[in-house]
Amino acid sequence: MAGLGCYFFVTYAFKVWAPIFMIRSFPEMETTQAVFHGVFWFYLGAFFGVTLGGRLSDALKIRRPGIRFEVEFVGLALCIPFILIMAFVHSLPLMILTILMFGFATGVYDSNIYAALFDVINPRFRAVGTGLFGCGGCIVGAFGPAVMGFLNDAFTPRLSMASLAIFAIVGSLAILCARVFTFNKDKI
């Protein structure tokens, strides 16, 4: 759940603050453009990430039982460099490309959220497990926009955007630990 909570923290904070970040990074940009560029490219990238991540993990599942956790780890870890590049880039085309790739990375992670959960939870507990897992992640994620607002007030917008990488690192490590230390004993 720590991985999902950190993922939601990062993505909720990004989606709420991306348009504001775009306006502050490119003052000549109109609000409509900032909202479009701040969110559309993210979701376009996520569409392709979900498609690729899901197909990859489904294809390799029989040979690599832990592949879904591994794909989640790679997806969330790939967010880190794109968050950092996005935070400090000064070119709109490069910003758009970075947001697209950040969305792709989150899509790779997203493609296996519940499939990975089903790999380790008894079928008779899947409904309650899914509900608790999702709610727990959302509760942690709900703090993302508020913390981002605090960081925007305390630091520069670029530094506050870069701080999201910390949560992506923590989430990635949580998923890696689950794969390495608990998956083999918990797998169904």
Descriptions of predicted regions:
Residues 67-70, 150-167:
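A membrane-interface helix-boundary motif in multi-pass transporters
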Residues 19, 49, 53, 144-152:
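Small-residue (Gly/Pro/Ala) motifs that create kinks and tight helix-helix packing interfaces
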Residues 118-155:
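A late C-terminal transmembrane helix in Major Facilitator Superfamily
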Residues 22-23, 56-57, 61, 148-156:
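Interfacial helix-cap and linker-helix signal at transmembrane-aqueous boundaries
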Residues 82, 86-88, 163-188:
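Multi-pass alpha-helical transporter architecture, strongest
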Residues 65-113:
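C-terminal transmembrane helical hairpin of 12-TM major facilitator-type secondary transporters
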Residues 1-51, 106-110, 114:
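Extracytoplasmic gate region of multi-pass secondary transporters
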